[in-house]
């Protein structure tokens, strides 16, 4: 199958990292980008130089209002209204909606007016069907607007699926120790709804909320209402880690649980879930393409029915790679109909 042609709306952290990943993805070709807040020259600069992921591995140039990536022209638009972005003219059948603004079906479907056939929201959505690769992508129903949930959900869900399928989760608590993101402050500033969230990101550990456990209940219905959790925002630029503590129905030793996760990582969830016994720290995970990297040495169990599991994720790179994998899956299903 020829590479699917994709447009990106929103050239922030996820938009640019999706683009970088797409250069390496055989099934995807980025043909257009839209961002109303930056000009083409600046977009080229931000794509080329990245403080976390380094210099772009390829050639970037500008031709008028367009980007030229490794000799291929990529249309660049600066429209504020997604309904007027001419996706059809560019050949983009699929759009990655990565502004963080148009996260409902009603808002995201505006892209269809410009000629896009499908929209994938790279964020949680209040009403769009959510799919997580390795967990529930096979239930894709052809909806025109879908969500890939959050980076934390993409880390948590595969791990929870393995444990629930094998041992049945009774209940659980999750904490994500999460790197700071663009919505946080470089210095203390106003944040009316979340006072602590307005404190400087580089100096503080900041308790916060996360919708990831609730989202897991949507992609794994058997876990609906069984998980809840929180976030601790920490002063690191990238890579986060999930701490999942669960009570399980079928008792198992920690070694048995590790083996079950290892088998899943080397089998049906390969490329989504990984297993390691190395003594990693967070920066070692930068650029890791997996959604969830289970740290066998970091977990502990109190007894055979109560266990804490730890799993890393590059909240930018790994998540962006799954966006492309979900796109490829959706396109394959669409083509078979």
Curated annotation (Swiss-Prot):
Annotated site, Activates thiol group during catalysis, chain positions: 178
Residue runs in coiled coils: none
Family: Belongs to the glyceraldehyde-3-phosphate dehydrogenase family.
GO aspect biological process, one term: glycolytic process
Keywords, comma-separated and alphabetical: Cytoplasm, Glycolysis, NAD, Oxidoreductase
Subcellular location: Cytoplasm
Name this protein carries in UniProt: Glyceraldehyde-3-phosphate dehydrogenase
Main location: cytoplasm
Active site (record annotation): 151
Residues where D-glyceraldehyde 3-phosphate binds: 150-152, 181, 210-211, 233
Pathway(s) of this molecule: Carbohydrate degradation; glycolysis; pyruvate from D-glyceraldehyde 3-phosphate: step 1/5
E.C. code: 1.2.1.12
Oligomer status and interactors: Homotetramer.
Species, as recorded: Colletotrichum lindemuthianum (Bean anthracnose fungus)
Annotated InterPro entries: GlycerAld/Erythrose_P_DH, GlycerAld_3-P_DH_AS, GlycerAld_3-P_DH_cat, GlycerAld_3-P_DH_NAD(P)-bd, Glyceraldehyde-3-P_DH_1, NAD(P)-bd_dom_sf
A GO CC annotation given for this chain: cytosol
SMART domains recorded: Gp_dh_N
Reactions it catalyzes: D-glyceraldehyde 3-phosphate + phosphate + NAD(+) = (2R)-3-phospho-glyceroyl phosphate + NADH + H(+)
High-level lineage: Eukaryota, Fungi, Dikarya, Ascomycota, Pezizomycotina
Keyword presence, GTP-binding: no
A molecular-function term among this protein's GO annotations: glyceraldehyde-3-phosphate dehydrogenase (NAD+) (phosphorylating) activity
SUPFAM superfamilies assigned to the protein according to its UniProt record, in alphabetical order: Glyceraldehyde-3-phosphate dehydrogenase-like, C-terminal domain, NAD(P)-binding Rossmann-fold domains
Top-rank taxon: Eukaryota
Positions that bind NAD(+): 13-14, 35, 80, 315
